[in-house]
């Protein structure tokens, strides 16, 4: 899977775990809903570390916790 797909899946999983909506996350971090929608459906060509930091912060976790998931193992990612 691509990095964008891994971020999308992780974000979706965390929102479910935290029982939080995309809208609530957007309100909390001040991000446009279209941006988070594009991230959640892997429609962004790239997602910056800064954006992932804001998403993680809005979910009440650290950047490390966001990335510390098997989705981000090198064997699971197609990195060109």
Regions found by a protein language model. Give the residues of each.
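A short, Lys/Arg-rich alpha-helix, primarily the initiator
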Residues: 1-20
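Phosphate-coordinating loops and pocket residues in cytosolic domains that bind phosphorylated ligands
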Residues: 8, 41, 68
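Residues within the helices of the helix-turn-helix
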Residues: 12, 23, 53, 64
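The alpha-helix within a helix-turn-helix
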Residues: 15, 26, 56
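Short alpha-helical DNA-recognition segment
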Residues: 19-38
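Short, charged recognition helix plus adjacent turn
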Residues: 38, 67-80
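Short, basic-rich loop-to-helix N-cap that marks the start of a DNA-contacting helix
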Residues: 43-54
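Intrinsically disordered, low-complexity basic tails/linkers immediately adjacent to helix-turn-helix/homeobox/MYB/SANT
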Residues: 57-65
